[in-house]
Amino acid sequence: ADMRLISCPGAEELTGLIDKHLVRWAKAAGIDKETFIIPCDCPRFQSGDAKGLVKESVRGDDIFIVVDPGNYSVTYKLFNYENHMSPDDHFANLKRLIQAVAGKAHRVSVIMPSLYGGRQHRRVVRESLDCAVALQELQTMGVRNIITFDAHDPRVQNAVPLMSFDNAMPTYQ
C-alpha cells in the first residue's frame, strides 16, 4: 500500500517537513514522487458546522493524518467574529478527515505531536477522562496507530490496549 499524508488545519508546516523527508528517502530508493500529501480541507458552514473533504482517492493507501491540537493560532470566522480553534475543534477536524477516508484507506494512523487531552490522564472524583475516551473513539473509528511525542502519562495507552501507541521521547533524539 502507498503511504500518504493528510494535514489537519494547523499542521501544514509539520506535514510539509515530514513530506520533504519522505520525498528525499523515496528518491534515494529510486521512487520518483513529488509529494505524499493529499490535498484536503475542513470548510465551515455559516452555522459553524464543518465537514472534512479529501480531494484525492485514498483507496488502498496507508494514510497518516497529522493534527496539532495545541495550535491556537488557527482561526475561523463565525458570525463575523474571528474564533481561535481549541483542542476540541482540532480533534473534531481530525475525526471529520478520518470519516472522509474511512472504508477506503488500507490503514489509518494519526500523528499527534501533543496528545489531545493528555493532561487529563487520571480521574479525581467526578471529572472526565478526555484523553482515554478520545483514544477509544479513534480506535472505534478504525485508527490503527497513534504516534505522539512526550505524552504526559504514557499509561493512557492502557485505554486502547489493542491499538498501537508510539510515544517518542525527546531524549531519544
Give the location of each predicted region:
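PRPP-associated nucleotide enzymes
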Residues: 1-173
